[in-house]
Structures are given as structure tokens and as C-alpha cells.
UniProtKB/Swiss-Prot annotation:
Region (Disordered): 83-108, 267-291, 1124-1185
Residues bearing the modification Phosphothreonine: 106
Highest taxon above the source species: Eukaryota
Entry keyword Plastid: no
Protein's UniProt name: Zinc finger MYM-type protein 4
Residues recorded with modification N-acetylalanine: 2
Protein task: Plays a role in the regulation of cell morphology and cytoskeletal organization.
Keyword Lipoprotein: no
Gene source species: Mus musculus
InterPro entries linked to this entry: DUF3504, TRASH_dom, Znf_MYM, ZnF_MYMT-QRICH1
Compositional bias per record (Basic and acidic residues), positions renumbered to this chain: 1125-1135
Cross-link (Glycyl lysine isopeptide (Lys-Gly) (interchain with G-Cter in SUMO2)): 139, 148, 195, 201, 232, 250, 273, 289, 327, 400, 428, 430, 1035, 1062, 1081, 1128, 1432
Lineage: Eukaryota, Metazoa, Chordata, Craniata, Vertebrata
Molecular functions (GO terms): zinc ion binding
């Protein structure tokens, strides 16, 4: 017995000094803990079970607040413990570490299984301990595998837990006595082993505690990383009973007072309140627990952990089995939980700001990591996120557009992309019932189909039967019926079936077909809407919906207003409602507003107390205090009266008992209501100009470091003008009044007008190239461009920072610059160069008001604190003395308030348990309603103890705004020596034009002296007299032709403007007069509707010095093309390849020209009726007016209708394909005109036979051209004059269609016209139909001579050449002398019906006269009349004039034809062009009767008064021009029409 006592004594001393053991193990196991965290093997299984003997109830409820049948942790256990969220919150497991019990036991078999396990473990542990003592102690310590952790996570479900804390204590006491008996029974040989066994158990507990604080991965469950007992299997189970022999344990003198102070007070632990877990437990309640101090914490969030965690662990240390082991062991200092950034994996330091996305659990160190993690730059979207519409089977790209619906027959929900698809699917699902009434089917009034009728509409006394919703919608649209239509989707609202939803917004009732449409309408409109109760303004998307008894949905700004509104509705109705406590039907006298906005009605205050006791049941004391959780307010309604809660007033309340906490709750409600009313009051700003108050978005002006606010744009502009708000314009460099200030690359630029701003942006675009035109976040222009796809839209940003901030703003994680709340920010404002974002208009007004007021306004927290202090002071004295202040109006991170008990463990420092305190960390809110605990003993002096002391820290931000004041001061400049002016007489004679002297003074006098000045007058006169007469004629002509003076003046103005523009541009030389004449762009201005000299400006090119000028411009074009290869890209080159395939003769629709033909025919008849009919037998030709092309094809050049515009890319592509084929065929790459090497074939010559190639070669060799080697170029603009001339000569002979067939002659002319237009479009002045290209014209004339117009089956003539094509490629007009001649030849052929050269040579100036006739309504018409010369009887029979009626020998006179003017387009008017032609001819030829077409001068300028010589034009040149004109379809139509009229007249005669 003495030996047993000797062994037991050291064991007790060891157990009493276990705190020193824990301290030393922490220091020596740091390296082990690190290695253990790195090498974790999850596949190991526990092999040692020796730890089940010494501490069988080690994880009892005092240790971890867990029972064997109840594994759900109380929220009080986790209060203050840092939470590390996992990636998937829905799959979080509540795991527990337990080294004894590995299975869940039921309530009935718990004690039996425990006893059996202890008996079996006693026998096994005795054998294992004996074997363990035989082994070497240091050798076991060297095993590396003992440091590998085994963690098994399992989900603990707490659903059937009904055991109270008192019941748990009884089980613990029973287990404790049984364990005491078993500990006293061991024989003497077990004492030493007990000491070793306990040593190992303590070491395992320390290792288990250290392992829980190791850094965890983001995927680890938060209970694994934060709670010390989160693992099912103990790590120490593999450690065994061995430690290193060199571990030294520090021994200190015993201190019983310290152990007594460390031990938790049993009375306080017995009164810990359980936290309700779910709605079922919350409604049924829990068993009673006494409570002395209650602490309600909504949520605590911290990055580096909470200081309450180690205190909580210390306060709940389990008591050991034996009396000697019943001392409380101090907890090991918890290792700081290391939280890592999910983006860059960096460890977040304590106090560092962390970012978290709404709805996600991942933490980030910065916004760059946040945006980079969520939106990877090259990460494709997962294919699993796409959903398919169940109706149309299309992919729904935007998740917000998904409409989920569940039908009766299926358990799964269906996804739809729109409401129409949902309706269509519902129609398909419904069974089709065919109703046969006397075998007659009913026809739908809309679609005219026989179907089942679903709608019958009585409209205008007619019943319309409709078969479907689609037909019903079409019927409503056709008749403009808008009854019962959904405001969101436009569908029909079936009000009779109760499916119609009514939303009361802005004083109007809007109807919706479903609740989804109501929500969608709120999100889309997002209007500022007043609350239905307090009338405070707020965005409709943020308000709370409530449907009243009438079915209308109203909007409320907060849960408080919704609760007050429901109380008002219940009390104002005066109906009996079932009490939520006693279930009796009576008029409610008390209402309890819950945190979710719902209302609980009670008939008496006792029912209120009974209802709250379901959640908080105090025992052992009769307290009159009813603790209120956050969000609960008791409203008392006096008997026989009702509370009014309209407008912004609060409902009338009266506390039943002055000593109850209901009075304090009502005081808090009143304080909160007053604060909300103050914060929601509309703030008005004062306009800086008109001094009026306004509540709209202000117009801001940043000038000289000050911000000026205006009510509108007009006031801002007027203020700038009055106060001379001027700055240097960034574009025009002139100091003017600022119109707008724009930010470019971080610098503000001022502009005087919108034009200057646009021009400056245009210049920047040329310099920068691809740049950010407008940053989506900071609204500035920057040369750097960063794009990101957000919400299906590509946004532009100027830098990474702006993209990061915009992403935070897009995902509604940014905070408002006004109210500092996080959420959707729909308003923005530019303030001092920065963009501020706000929730709504109220926040903008509040922000601007705060900036204008000198003293900063009180913050929300300060107002709330003041209100709550006043509320607390208004209560009874006893209540103020016993309770702590309540912190209100703080945004909570928890979804619902939860009352979480806790125990203060600072008794070691103070020696007594103080009142419960509150701690605010970050954005968390803490509310404390507690009673004063009984007084404790005075603190005692402690001796040499290391305590875990962590002060409660609080971060406080103070906003200090300095008072700014402007004061003008002046610094005196250093004084300079004063300069004294001393007059010194100087003997200088100064002549003064005054009569001060007696002698005469010379005065300058001007005498006009004639000086001869040489002048060069262009004239072809032979002698001086004729020259003088020519000068007089020119003077008279200029005086009598004012329109020509206008032409010359317009040409001079255009030349002067061009000179000024070239002078302003740097590096450009003056434009000479010859360059002005040759530059096409100078004169290609917009052609107006008046004459005003535009004909003169069209005169661009002349035939003088053609070869030199064309080579010069060809070389210049080559340089331009090399510098800018993208001058004219082949935009349509891929499509415009085969002209005849795209425009076949079969597709010609003569109806497209019907309008013009009818107009011409009517005009001809009208003019014929207006002319007096001659009495002679020969009928006079009617007037042929010019076809008003502008009415059909547009007034501007090149803007014709499809099918009427010249597609010049056909010619360019044909040239390109031909050159490619030519270069590929000829190895030398030389173009040889003539000889045997001119083998012609098509680009697709592979489909042709060798016989065709040989025939083409023979045909080309017969041309007789001199062989010249020319390198062909695909780009026609790069060809010189000679290359282009020879190339075109060969091109028209060898070009083929893509299928290898030859082009028709009209198609070849079409291709050549396209090439001509392409040259003009790109700045080349070459006219390929003039004398320098004579060889090409000869070959083209030969080719066109064999062409005859195609007669279609309907009788119309077909040709691909139209009149508009000649106007577009500048072959008609007044651009040059030869073009003007070609235009007159065209008009004479078309309207005078002159078909050959012989008939045209009969024209003369004497036979063509300009006449004017007055028509109806006093309108005048100018026309040209041509009188053909008399036919001589001896004229040869083969020279009969075609197109004119054959006359008998007794005819009196030939018939005169007329050509009317074109008033719609003066530039295409035949009369004006003829007058312009006369002005450019010599006076000597204007009365000649033998000539009409004159030879152009070799050298002339546009300002020259004469373009033509006195000699007639060569008949060969005239024939070449006429051949091309006869290819025009409109000419053949006019000739055919005139021929038919002549034949009709002959038949009538």
C-alpha cells in the first residue's frame, strides 16, 4: 500500500503541473508541427487505442459542447473564432475530432456501449502499456510516421437533438463517478504506467490543438481549420506513449488560487443558452437553460482571427477524471490562422484589407487578384453553364434570361429563353380537345384556320373568335387594343383567374402577368420611387415588395416600414386574428415585428412573453426583462384604439410595464425611425447662377480649383459668359469661353466649341491609331487600349486599374461615394477630375451638399449613437443602470440575427466576472442586452504566471476636413533706384508742317504719269484692229453674261480656298495655276440645284501636254501607292467578278424604268399640246424634255438605285485577273503588242482548247503593233501612261469571263468605264477615251461597231450601258473641252434623233436656236430648237436621214425638233451646257452655218475665255465618240420611240 502511495504521489504532482507541460511542449513541438502539416497522409488508420483508458470522456460537452448523439456545434462555440470559408459553401461539413468514439450512438444505447468499450479497453491497454515500457523511449521518438495526420471529414447532422445542457451535465456526472471507481481499482503495477499514459494523452491533446491551427487550403472546411475538435480521428493515436528524452519540464511552486481562478464558474456555465439551429427548432423551442448575461452577435468577420477564440477555448476546458485532475489546464496559445489570397496565394496579414465577391466565399488581397481570378483573359466559359430552351432548343447565353418553370407531370424544372417560348410549351403540353358542333369547325378570325377557339372578343358589336394567344396578340395590335396587357412582356393578363399582378408605383397601377415580370420590370426601370409608408425616395430595384389584401403590390424602403405597414393594416381592419401564442381569435393588442418583416399578433402581453420564452426560457429567477433580438420590436395597441402609421410618422406605442425591455425596444424603434427620416430627407442644392434650389442632378463646373453647381446647362453657359470663364482652346489656340472640358491621358483639355473637340479627337486618332476613345470607367481618352468582355458587351479601358475598378463596379461590389454602402451604383458624377459613383440621385445631392458646407455633416454611425444614447437615457433609471447601450444602424454580415451566448474569460486578470462587453470588428454589428452579474471577489496578486492577454482593439476613422479660405496677398518687389528725367536741350531742327517760319516750305505733290504695262490677251486675231474688236467683244460678253462671271468668280474662290488650306498645312508648297487646273478634287464639289458657275468648276482636264502630264501623275500615283498601300482596297473584289452572270439579260426588269418612261411620255404630250399646231401638212416634232434622273436615282453623284450604278470593281477585278493570267502565261512577263507571242486566252484558259489559244494568237498577231516589252502590274493605279495605253489595247482583246467565255461588246465597254471611274476615284486624271489613248480608242471602236442591241421577248431593248454610267465616270459634263463635246453629241443623238456622223455634221450654230415659251400658270420654259437644212432634190438616195419622216416633194419645210431644259439638275441641263459651249467659242463662229462641233485648243486653262478653235472637229473622232454613245440603252429607247411616233403619224396621214 505504501508502494502504491509512493507511485500515486508523483502522478498527482504531474497532473497538477500539467500546465507547465503544455507550455514546454508548445516550444519544443514547433518544428514537429510544421513537418506534420507538410506530410499529411490521409490513407493511414489508427493503430494504437491505448489513449481510451486514461481519458474516456475527454471530448465531453464541456470540452467541445458535443454529445455522442448530438454532433452539431452550437453557434456560441464558434463566436469569435475566425472563419475560413471554402469554395463551396453548400458542401461545408461540420466535422469533429474525437480520439475515442468513432461512430454515432443513439440515446438509448449510449451508456451501455460506453461501459462495454471501457471494459474492453482496460484489458487491451494493460497489455499494450506493459509492452510499451519495454521499448526504448528515444527510438520511438525518431519515427517519422507518428507526425502524419489522419483527418476524416464527415457531415454531422443535428436534427433530432432534444437533450438539454442540464441533461448533458447529468450524463457527465454519471460517467465521472464510474471513471473514478475504475481509476481507484488498478493494482500497484499500473501507477507508473498511468503517469506515462497521461503524459501521452496530454501530448496528444497539445498536438491535436496545434494541428487545428495549421494553415489550411481554401477548400478545407472552416471547422477543420478553426475549431480544435474538428477531426474524427486523433493525431495522437499514432504518436503512442513516447516523447523525446531531452524534453525538460519546468517546475514551479503550486498555486491553488490561480487554478481556482482559471477554472470556469459552474453557475455561469450552467446558464449558457443554446443557439437555435433551424426553423423547426426555432418554432418548437429548446429546453430551458438559465442565463445571467446574454450576448446577441450577428456575425464577426476577421482576416487574421479573433481574440475571443483562445478565450473561448480556455473557458470551456474539460475537467479531468480524478479529483487531482479536476484542475483547469490553461490553453495553448492559438497559432494565427493563415488565410491566403485565392488569386496570388499570398498570406493575408493581420489588419490587411480583404476583398470578397458578393455570393462567394473566396478572399482576395486586391481588386487585381479579384478581377484576374474571376475573369481570366484566355479562359473560355465552361460549357456546362449554357442552358438550352425546352421549346426552341436554342442556347441561352445570358443566365439572367433563363425562365425556369415546373409542370404538374414532371418533377424537374424546364428552362426557357423567353415568355413566348414558355407559353408555346404550355400550349403543347395541354391536351387538345376537339369540339365538334354539328360537324362544323370554327374558323379563327385572325389566321383563318379551323381550330379550337380560345378567345372570343366582342369588338364593335362583332364577336371575333381567336384560336391562340398569338392570334389574340395580333388582333390587339391590329386594332390598337391595350387592355389587360403586361407592362413587361406585353402578354395578356387573365384577371379573372387571379394570375394578374398589380404593382402600385408612381401613383399608377401597372399590371403584370406573373411575379417574374414584376421583378424584371423593377430591375429594368429602376426608378426613384417613394416608400408606401414613409414616402422616402429610393430605387425601385432595392425596395421590398408586399402584396396587400386587394392584390396590389406595394414597395417599401425597409423591413421596418413593411412591419409598421402590416401593423397598421391589421389594426385598422379591426378584425379578429388568431393569437400566435394562445391560438385564440381576438382583436390583437400587441404585435411583434420579426427580422424577416413578418408580424406576430398577440392578444395580451402575457402571450408576448410566453411567445418569447419559446426561444429564451430563463429559469431560477423571475426576471421581468424580455430580451429582444435584433430586428424585433414590440408594439402595444391600447384597447379600443388603433395606431396610425401613415406618412413619415411612427405608430403610437405604449409600454405595458415600465420595467420591461419592451420600453427600451420601443425607444430604439423611435430613435431608428427618427434617424431614417433625417437620412432620407431630400437635400436641395442652390444654383450658382439663378440662386434657385433644385433637387436634380447638378451641372458642375471646375474652374480655378473650385466646383460650381448649377441647375442646368443653360445656367452654366450663362454663368460662363457673365463671369468670363475663359481658357485657351486646345485646338484653335485662341482664348475663348470654355464650352467643354475633356480629359485626355490624365490632363484636362478645354475647348471652345463642339467642332474643335471633334477635330482634336480626329487628329489624335490619326496620331495614336487604335486607342481608347472613351474609357468606360474614368471617361477619358488615352492612347492605351484595354478591352474586356463584361456581361456580353466589350468595354474599353485606358489602363488595368480602370478595368479592375469597373469590374468591381459591374459586379456590385463597389461602395457608394456618398452613403458608403455596397451594392448597385446607378449614378455617376465627375468631381475634380475623378469619377464618383452613387446609389441614386439622393446620394449625389447629399455628396454635393457635404462638399459645399464647410462643417462636415455627422456620420451615420454618430447619428445612430446619439439617437441610441437618447433612447437609453429616456428609459427608467434601473434599466439604464443594468443594461449596456445598443449599437444600431450598422450593416450586418449575417442573413438573420442570431442570439449567441458567450462567456467572458478575463476573470484571471480581474479576479471576477465583469459585465458582458461588445466588440466591433470591420463591418460586423454586435448588440448586447445583459444583466449585471453578481459581484465577485477582489482581485488577488498573482505570482510569476504567463497569461494569454489580448486587448480588445477597435479601429476608428476620423474624417477631418480643413477649413479653406482664400486671401489675396502681394509681395513687394525690391525697390529700384528712381530714374530722374533731366531735359537736355539739343540743337536739332525738326521740320513741322506748320507755318511757323517766314520762308516757304517744300510740300510733296503727286503728278499722275502714264506708264505702259504689257498685258497678254489670248486672241487669234490677225491684226491690231481685230484684236481691239476682240477685247471689246470680251468686255461686252462679260457684261451680258452674268452667269459666266459667276462661274469665273466661283472658280477663283475655290482656288483661293485651296491655296489657303495648303498654306496652313506644313511641308506643302503653293499650288500653281496649272496644278489647280489638273487636280480633279479641287473642282469635284457638291453639285447644287442652281447654275452658279458649277459648269466652270467641272472643267478639269484638257488635252494639252497629255503624255507629259499623265506620266507625271502616274509617277506621283506610284509614290502615293507605295506610301499608302491601303488607299483604295478591293472592298468588293471577292464578289464582283462576273458581270454578265450578275446582270444577265433575263433579269432586266423594264418596270423599274416605268416611272421615268411615263413621266417622259406625259411631258411630251403636254408640250405638244402647249405648242400651236401648224396648218401645213407636215407635223412638227414635239419637245423632248430631259429625263429628271435625280428623281429616280438621287440628287448626289454615285447615289443611284441598285442596278443603275456603275460597279467599277468589275473592271478592276477583270484587269487584275487578266494581268495575273498574262504574267503566268508569259514567262518573260512582257507585254508584246504584235508578233507571234501575243497569244490571247482567258484567265481560265484551262477550260479552253489549244485550238482556241492558237486562234486567239493568230487574231492578236494581225493587229500589226510594234513589239514592246512591258511589265504588267496588277494594280492599275501603278501603271504609267504608256503601260496603261498598251495594256488596255491588249486587255479588250484577251479578257474573258471566269468560265472562259468571251464578254459581249457592251460588257467590255462597261469594264472600261469601270476602270475610268476607278482612276478618277483614286486621283488619276487620265481619260482613256481621249486622244492620248488613240490606239485603244481605235481598237475599242472596231469592237463596238459589230454590236447591236438585244431585243428581249417582251419587246424591250437590253444593254448594260446606261446614261447614268457615263455621268458617273465623267464622260458627260463640262469637265474638259472634249467631254463637253461628247455631252453635246449625246444630247443631240438622244433628243434630235441624229444617228450617224453625216446627220451630226449638218448641225450648225445658225440652225440651233435658244427659245423661251410661256406655258400654263405663267410658267416659262427654255428649249433649244433645231431646224434641219432644206433637202436638195439631187441628194443621193443613200443619205436619207434616219429617224425623220419621209416627205413628199411638195412638203413646205422640214420639221424642227426641240430639246427642253432640265430644271431639276442644272448640271445636266442641255440648254445650259449649250450656252456654256457658246461662251467658250469665238464670236466669229457663232453665226456660221457649216460647223457645230469645233476642234479643242491644244493648250488652255479653265479661266481661259476660249476652249475651242475655229476649225471643225475631225469626223473620225466624232465617229469614235458616237459609237460609244450608241451603246447607251436610253438612246436606243428614245430612237425607237421616235420611230414609232413617225410611223403612227404616217398612218394617220
Amino acid at each position: 500500500m505504501a508502494e502504491r502511495e509512493v507511485e500515486t504521489g508523483p502522478r498527482k504532482r504531474f497532473e497538477q503541473k500539467s500546465d507547465a507541460v503544455f507550455d514546454e511542449i508548445v516550444e519544443n513541438c514547433g518544428v514537429m508541427d510544421t513537418e506534420m502539416s507538410e506530410d499529411t497522409d490521409h490513407n493511414l488508420t489508427p493503430t494504437l487505442a491505448s489513449m481510451s483508458y486514461g481519458m474516456p470522456n475527454q471530448t465531453g460537452s464541456e470540452n467541445s459542447l458535443l454529445d455522442e448523439d448530438d454532433y452539431f456545434l452550437n453557434s456560441g462555440d464558434l463566436a469569435g473564432i475566425p472563419v475560413v470559408s471554402s469554395d463551396n459553401e453548400d458542401e461545408q461539413d461540420c466535422s469533429s475530432k474525437d480520439n475515442l468514439v468513432s461512430s454515432v450512438h443513439t440515446d438509448g444505447s449510449l451508456e451501455v456501449e460506453r461501459r462495454a468499450a471501457h471494459q474492453e479497453s482496460d484489458n487491451e491497454n494493460e497489455i499494450q502499456i506493459q509492452n510499451q515500457l519495454k521499448k526504448d523511449f528515444p527510438k520511438q521518438f525518431d519515427q517519422v510516421s507518428v507526425f502524419k495526420s489522419i483527418r476524416k471529414d464527415f457531415c454531422l447532422v443535428r436534427e433530432n437533438s432534444k437533450e438539454t445542457f442540464s441533461g448533458k451535465e447529468k450524463n457527465r456526472d454519471l460517467t465521472y463517478h464510474e471513471r473514478e471507481k475504475r481509476l481507484d481499482k488498478p493494482h500497484k503495477g499500473l501507477d507508473s504506467r498511468l503517469k506515462s499514459s497521461f503524459f501521452d494523452k496530454a501530448a496528444n491533446q497539445v498536438e491535436e490543438t496545434l494541428h487545428t491551427h495549421l494553415p489550411q487550403n481554401p477548400e478545407t472546411n472552416f471547422r477543420d481549420s478553426s475549431y480544435p475538435f474538428a477531426s474524427k480521428e486523433s493525431i495522437g493515436s499514432e504518436l503512442g506513449n513516447s516523447f523525446a528524452s531531452n524534453i525538460r519540464i519546468k517546475e514551479e511552486p503550486l498555486d491553488d488560487e490561480y487554478d481556482r481562478a482559471v477554472a470556469p464558474q459552474q453557475g455561469l456555465l450552467d446558464r449558457v443558452k443554446d443557439e437555435p439551429d433551424n426553423a423547426q427548432e426555432y418554432s418548437h423551442g429548446q429546453q430551458q437553460k438559465t442565463q445571467e448575461g446574454e450576448l446577441k452577435i450577428s456575425a464577426v468577420f476577421s482576416v487574421s482571427g479573433s481574440p475571443l477564440a483562445p478565450q473561448l477555448t480556455t473557458g470551456f476546458q474539460p475537467s479531468l477524471a480524478s479529483p487531482g485532475m479536476n484542475k483547469m489546464l490553461p490553453s495553448v496559445p492559438a497559432t494565427a490562422v493563415r488565410v491566403s489570397c485565392s488569386g496570388c496565394k499570398k498570406i493575408l496579414q493581420k489588419g490587411q484589407t480583404a476583398y470578397q465577391r458578393k455570393g462567394s466565399t473566396q478572399l482576395f488581397c486586391s481588386t487585381l487578384c479579384l478581377t484576374g481570378y474571376t475573369v481570366p483573359p484566355a479562359r473560355p466559359p465552361p460549357p456546362l453553364t449554357k442552358k438550352t430552351c425546352s421549346s426552341c432548343s436554342k442556347d441561352i447565353l445570358n443566365p439572367k434570361d433563363v425562365i425556369s418553370a415546373q409542370f404538374e407531370n414532371s418533377t424537374t424544372s424546364k428552362d426557357f429563353c423567353s415568355q413566348s417560348c414558355l407559353s408555346t410549351y404550355e400550349l403543347k403540353k395541354k391536351p387538345i380537345v376537339t369540339i365538334n358542333t354539328n360537324s362544323i369547325s370554327t374558323k379563327c378570325s385572325m389566321c383563318q384556320k379551323n381550330a379550337v377557339i380560345r378567345h372570343e372578343v366582342n369588338y364593335q358589336n362583332v364577336v371575333h373568335k381567336l384560336c391562340s394567344d398569338a392570334c389574340f396578340s395580333k388582333f390587339r395590335s391590329a386594332n390598337n387594343l391595350t387592355m389587360n396587357c403586361c407592362e413587361n412582356c406585353g402578354g395578356y393578363c387573365y384577371s379573372g383567374s387571379g394570375q394578374c399582378h398589380v404593382l402600385q408605383i408612381e401613383g399608377q397601377s401597372k399590371k403584370f402577368c406573373s411575379s417574374m415580370c414584376v421583378t424584371s420590370y423593377k430591375q429594368k426601370s429602376a426608378k426613384i420611387t417613394p416608400c408606401a409608408l414613409c414616402k422616402s425616395l429610393r430605387s425601385s430595384a432595392e425596395m421590398i415588395e408586399n402584396t396587400n389584401s386587394l392584390g396590389k403590390t406595394e414597395l417599401f424602403c425597409s423591413v421596418n416600414c413593411l412591419s409598421a405597414y402590416r401593423v397598421k393594416m391589421v389594426t385598422s381592419a379591426g378584425v379578429q386574428v388568431q393569437c400566435n401564442s394562445c391560438k385564440t381569435s381576438a382583436i390583437p393588442q400587441y404585435h411583434l415585428a420579426m427580422s424577416d418583416g413578418s408580424i406576430r399578433n398577440f392578444c395580451s402581453y402575457s402571450c408576448v412573453v410566453a411567445f418569447q420564452n419559446l426561444f429564451n426560457k430563463p429559469t431560477g429567477m423571475n426576471s421581468s426583462v424580455v430580451p429582444l433580438s435584433q430586428g424585433q420590436v414590440i408594439v402595444s395597441i391600447p384597447t379600443g384604439s388603433s395606431a396610425s402609421a401613415g406618412g413619415g410618422s411612427t405608430p403610437a406605442v405604449s409600454p405595458t410595464s415600465i420595467n420591461s425591455s419592451a420600453a427600451a425596444g420601443l425607444q430604439r424603434l423611435a430613435a431608428q425611425s427618427q434617424h431614417v427620416g433625417f437620412a432620407r430627407s431630400v437635400v436641395k442644392l442652390r444654383c450658382q447662377h439663378c440662386n434657385r434650389l433644385f433637387a436634380t442632378k447638378p451641372e458642375l463646373l471646375d474652374y480655378k480649383g473650385k466646383m460650381f453647381q448649377f441647375c442646368g446647362k443653360n445656367c452654366c453657359d450663362e454663368y460662363k459668359k457673365i463671369n468670363n470663364v475663359m481658357a485657351m482652346c486646345e485646338y484653335c489656340k485662341i482664348e475663348k469661353i470654355i464650352k467643354e472640358t475633356v480629359r485626355f491621358s490624365g490632363a484636362d483639355k478645354s475647348f471652345c466649341s463642339e467642332g474643335c473637340k471633334l477635330l482634336y479627337k480626329h487628329d489624335l486618332g490619326k496620331r495614336w491609331g487604335s486607342h481608347c476613345k472613351m474609357c468606360s470607367y474614368c471617361l477619358q481618352t488615352s492612347p492605351k487600349l484595354i478591352q474586356n468582355n463584361l456581361g456580353g458587351k466589350v468595354e474599353d479601358f485606358c489602363c488595368e486599374e480602370c478595368m479592375s475598378k469597373y469590374t468591381v463596379l459591374f459586379y456590385q461590389m463597389a461602395k457608394c461615394d456618398g452613403c458608403k454602402r455596397q451594392g448597385k451604383l446607378s449614378e455617376s458624377l465627375k468631381w475634380r477630375g475623378d469619377i464618383k459613383h452613387f446609389c441614386n440621385l439622393l446620394c449625389i445631392l447629399m455628396f454635393c451638399h457635404q462638399q459645399t458646407v464647410c462643417d462636415p455633416p455627422l456620420q451615420n454611425n454618430a447619428v445612430a449613437s446619439i439617437s441610441m444614447v437618447q433612447a437609453a437615457s429616456a428609459g427608467p433609471p434601473s434599466l439604464r443602470k443594468d443594461s449596456t447601450p445598443v449599437i444600431a444602424n450598422v450593416v450586418s454580415l449575417a442573413s438573420a440575427p442570431a442570439a449567441q451566448p458567450t462567456a467572458n474569460t478575463n476573470s484571471v486578470l480581474q479576479g471576477a466576472v465583469p459585465t458582458v462587453t461588445a466588440k466591433i470588428i470591420g463591418d460586423a454589428s454586435t448588440q448586447t442586452d445583459a444583466l449585471k452579474l453578481p459581484p465577485s471577489q477582489p482581485p488577488r496578486l498573482l505570482k510569476n504566471k504567463a497569461l494569454l492577454c489580448k486587448p480588445i482593439t477597435q479601429t476608428k476613422a476620423t474624417s477631418c476636413k480643413p477649413h479653406t479660405q482664400n486671401k489675396e496677398c502681394q509681395t513687394d518687389t525690391p525697390s529700384e533706384p528712381q530714374v530722374m528725367v533731366v531735359p537736355v536741350p539739343v540743337p536739332v531742327f525738326v521740320p513741322i508742317p506748320l507755318h511757323l517760319y517766314t520762308q516757304y516750305t517744300p510740300v510733296p505733290f503727286g503728278i499722275p504719269v502714264p506708264m505702259p504695262v504689257p498685258m497678254f490677251i489670248p486672241s487669234s486675231m490677225d491684226n491690231d484692229e481685230k484684236a481691239t474688236e476682240g477685247i471689246e467683244d470680251i468686255k461686252e460678253k462679260l457684261a451680258t453674261h452674268p452667269f459666266e462671271a459667276d462661274l469665273l468668280e466661283m472658280a477663283e474662290m475655290i482656288a483661293e480656298d485651296e491655296e489657303k488650306e495648303k498654306t496652313l498645312s506644313q511641308g506643302e508648297s503653293q499650288t500653281s495655276e496649272q496644278e489647280l487646273f489638273l487636280d480633279t478634287k479641287i473642282f469635284e464639289k457638291d453639285q447644287g440645284s442652281t447654275y452658279s458657275g458649277d459648269l466652270e468648276s467641272e472643267a478639269v482636264s484638257t488635252p494639252h501636254s497629255w503624255e507629259e502630264e499623265l506620266n507625271h501623275y502616274a509617277l506621283k500615283s506610284n509614290a502615293v501607292q507605295d506610301a499608302d498601300s491601303e488607299l483604295k482596297p478591293f472592298s468588293k473584289g471577292e464578289t464582283e467578278q462576273d458581270l454578265e452572270a450578275d446582270f444577265p439579260s433575263e433579269s432586266f426588269d423594264p418596270l423599274n424604268k416605268g416611272q421615268g418612261i411615263q413621266a417622259r411620255s406625259r411631258t411630251r404630250r403636254r408640250h405638244r399640246d402647249g405648242f400651236p399646231q401648224p396648218r401645213r401638212r407636215g407635223r412638227k416634232k414635239s419637245v423632248v424634255p430631259v429625263e429628271p434622273r435625280s428623281l429616280i436615282q438621287g440628287a448626289l453623284q454615285g447615289c443611284s438605285v441598285s442596278g443603275m450604278t456603275l460597279k467599277y470593281m468589275y473592271g478592276v477585278n477583270a484587269w487584275k485577273n487578266w494581268v495575273q493570267w498574262k504574267n503566268a502565261k508569259d514567262e518573260q512577263g512582257d507585254l508584246k503588242c504584235g508578233g507571234g507571242e501575243l497569244a490571247s486566252a482567258s484567265p481560265c484558259s484551262d477550260s479552253l482548247g489549244s485550238a482556241q489559244d492558237h486562234a486567239l494568237s493568230q487574231e492578236s498577231s494581225e493587229q500589226g503593233c510594234k513589239a514592246r516589252s512591258v511589265k504588267l502590274k496588277e494594280d492599275i493605279l501603278s501603271c504609267t501612261f504608256s503601260e496603261l495605253s498598251l495594256g488596255l489595247c491588249q486587255f479588250i482583246q484577251e479578257v474573258r469571263r471566269p468560265n472562259g467565255e468571251k464578254y459581249d461588246p457592251d460588257s467590255i465597254l462597261y469594264l472600261c468605264l469601270g476602270i475610268q471611274q476607278y482612276l478618277f476615284e483614286n486621283g488619276r486624271i487620265d481619260n482613256i477615251f481621249t486622244e492620248p489613248y488613240s490606239r485603244f480608242m481605235i481598237e475599242l471602236t472596231k469592237l463596238l461597231k459589230i454590236w447591236e442591241p438585244t431585243i428581249l421577248p417582251n419587246g424591250y431593248m437590253f444593254s448594260r450601258i446606261e446614261e447614268e454610267h457615263l455621268w458617273e465616270c465623267k464622260q458627260l459634263g463640262a469637265y474638259s473641252p472634249i467631254v463637253l463635246l461628247n455631252t453635246l453629241l449625246f444630247f443631240n443623238t438622244k433628243y434630235f434623233q441624229l444617228r450617224n456622223v453625216t446627220e451630226h455634221l449638218k448641225l450648225s450654230f445658225a440652225h440651233v436656236m435658244r427659245r423661251t415659251r410661256t406655258l400654263k400658270y405663267s410658267t416659262k420654259m427654255t428649249y433649244l430648237r433645231f431646224f434641219p437644212p432644206l433637202q436638195k432634190p439631187e441628194s443621193e438616195p443613200d443619205k436619207v436621214t434616219i429617224g425623220k419622216r419621209k416627205r413628199n416633194e411638195d412638203d413646205e419645210a422640214p420639221v424642227g425638233v426641240e430639246m427642253a431644259e432640265n430644271t431639276d439638275n442644272p448640271l445636266r441641263c442641255p440648254v445650259r451646257l449649250y450656252e456654256f459651249y457658246l461662251s467658250k467659242c469665238s464670236e466669229s463662229v457663232k453665226q456660221r452655218s457649216d460647223v457645230f462641233y469645233l476642234q479643242p485648243e491644244r493648250s488652255c486653262v479653265p479661266n481661259s475665255p476660249m476652249w475651242y478653235s475655229t476649225f471643225p472637229i475631225d469626223p473620225g473622232t466624232l465617229d469614235t465618240m458616237l459609237t460609244r454613245i450608241l451603246m447607251v440603252r436610253e438612246v436606243h429607247e428614245e430612237l425607237a420611240k421616235a420611230k414609232s411616233e413617225d410611223s403612227d403619224a404616217e398612218l394617220s396621214d
